[in-house]
């Protein structure tokens, strides 16, 4: 059976606020070189008029035309609007969180509900049409949109329903994590979500879902009770541990490979107290000492304590320059207990900056009083970036030495960050095969990223970051698909480990034609 609505309905409204973290972008090749990006379909229509033959792009990246009659039939069958390039609202609908990606879909289906999603998926499959799915539009690689294809846009689907007594929530696929946090925190409940309030719950959850509460309550997928999902055949299915359990296993960590999730049902936990959160920044000369102190403390830390260590070349220190620091989230009931746990880190000396304090969960998440903000216009001034990620299963001194040396060698013209965030706790206690998320035993999730706006420096900066990554990669195993969805097949296989063959079987069963391919793609074997 499908997830049924509760009697209590939310009054959530769309939010498009830009988070504090910098724009990140994984390298992604053009989907269709045969057609000039954005132009053919952008010029193909006048407002409100459907051309007799609409130029689009196929799944194979080749030119494809679709008859006006087919488009009219789709539009008539949708409750939400179907937008072409010159229709009112098209430009705002196609924009993503990262303005570096200036995609122009031929069609945008602004879905009003699961029935619209099913019709859009059936249309795409029938025509062999390149298809992108937008939940929150926060994809680091821009895969929430596509040039010349169909964008299935879940942004209008914002309903959130909370069962306070049963401690569960159902949220539609267009909800942002800040919206869900505010709704659940209003009654003193929470579940594991990410750390950027403008992230969509859909992509976050399907890739695993790391966040401040994961060491005590597990990943987002560990708190997922069921989903409603439209698979590639256009059917709306319910998936849980008792209904379509194979599909439910696959979507918990397998990303968007198996369909479009229209509803997520989460387990909620009591959380109505202050938590300890913030960071301390030190001179770069103390980088090795910071690494050593943090990893030593983390090795014996209770589940309530989560630590991270980061190298930064931005403007965190006076006059800019390199710095090293640690970040903390203590989710226990008493922040003073967290302060006592941090005493070994205080021995590092007086920091250049200290933001650690007792705050509400919403404040830590950046969702407290968050206001709407316009998504920036894409264009030539949009930033470029290079991002690589991986999991650390050990932290030898040689790793610290390599990180410090490689990071210091990066050009001063590319603001960069290298951060390793603690895992473990409830994440590691589940079996590696219980869900598709394989890297549960990892000690840390690592990210290296540089971002710049002078596009004339693209080649030099990417080369420098690649050289830095070349020295670090040997210490990693697999990667987090939500931060690097465009990685090569070899790394993808390492990411899913022994779960990969089973995921391929699920892909063969639920999406044998690889309709859902704009993701960390698990290709069908057929």
What are these regions (language model features)?
Residues 2-526:
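Soluble FAD-dependent oxygen oxidases
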């Amino acid at each position: 059976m499908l997830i049924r609505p509760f009697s209590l309905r939310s009054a959530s409204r769309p939010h498009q606020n830009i988070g504090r973290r910098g724009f990140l972008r994984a390298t992604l090749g053009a989907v269709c070189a045969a057609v000039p990006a954005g132009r053919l379909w952008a010029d193909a229509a006048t407002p409100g008029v459907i051309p007799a033959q609409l130029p689009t792009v196929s799944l194979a990246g080749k030119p494809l035309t679709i008859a006006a009659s087919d488009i009219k039939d789709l539009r008539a069958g949708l409750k939400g609007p179907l937008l072409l390039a010159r229709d009112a609202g098209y430009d705002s609908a196609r924009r993503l969180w990262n303005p570096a990606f200036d995609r122009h879909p031929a069609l945008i289906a602004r879905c009003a509900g699961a029935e619209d999603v099913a019709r859009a998926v059936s249309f795409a499959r029938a025509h062999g049409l390149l298809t992108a799915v937008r939940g929150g539009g926060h994809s680091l690689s821009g895969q929430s949109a596509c040039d010349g294809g169909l964008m299935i846009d879940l942004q209008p689907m914002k309903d959130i329903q909370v069962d306070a007594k049963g401690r569960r929530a159902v949220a539609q696929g267009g909800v942002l994590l800040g919206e869900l946090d505010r709704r659940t925190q209003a009654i003193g409940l929470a579940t594991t979500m990410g750390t950027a309030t403008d992230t969509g719950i859909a992509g976050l959850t399907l890739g695993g879902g790391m966040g401040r509460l994961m060491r005590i309550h597990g990943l987002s997928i560990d708190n997922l009770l069921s989903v409603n999902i439209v698979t590639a055949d256009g059917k709306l299915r319910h998936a849980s541990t008792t209904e379509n359990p194979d599909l439910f296993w696959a979507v918990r960590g397998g990303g968007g490979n198996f369909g479009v999730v229209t509803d997520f049902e989460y387990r909620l936990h009591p959380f109505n107290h202050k938590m300890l959160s913030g960071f301390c920044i030190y001179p770069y000369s103390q980088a090795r000492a910071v690494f050593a102190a943090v990893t030593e403390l983390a090795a014996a830390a209770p589940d309530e304590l989560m630590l991270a260590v980061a190298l930064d070349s931005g403007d965190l220190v006076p006059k800019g320059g390199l710095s090293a620091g640690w970040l903390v989230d203590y989710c226990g009931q008493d922040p003073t207990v967290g302060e006592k746990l941090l005493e070994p880190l205080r021995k590092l000396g007086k920091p250049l900056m200290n933001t650690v304090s007792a705050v509400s969960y919403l404040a830590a998440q950046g969702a407290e009083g968050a206001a709407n903000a316009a998504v920036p216009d894409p264009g030539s001034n949009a930033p470029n970036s290079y991002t690589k990620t991986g999991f650390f299963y050990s932290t030898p001194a040689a790793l610290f030495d390599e990180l410090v040396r490689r990071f210091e060698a990066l050009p001063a013209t590319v603001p960069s960050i290298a951060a390793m965030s603690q895992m473990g706790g409830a994440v590691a206690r589940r079996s590696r095969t219980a869900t598709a998320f394989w890297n549960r035993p990892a000690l840390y999730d690592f990210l290296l990223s540089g971002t710049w706006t002078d596009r004339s420096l693209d080649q030099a900066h990417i080369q420098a970051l690649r050289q830095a990554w070349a020295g670090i990669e040997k210490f990693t195993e697999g990667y987090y698909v939500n931060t690097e969805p465009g990685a090569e097949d070899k790394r993808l296989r390492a990411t899913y480990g022994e779960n990969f063959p089973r995921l391929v079987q699920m892909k063969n069963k639920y999406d044998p034609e690889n309709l859902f391919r704009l993701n960390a793609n698990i290709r069908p074997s057929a």
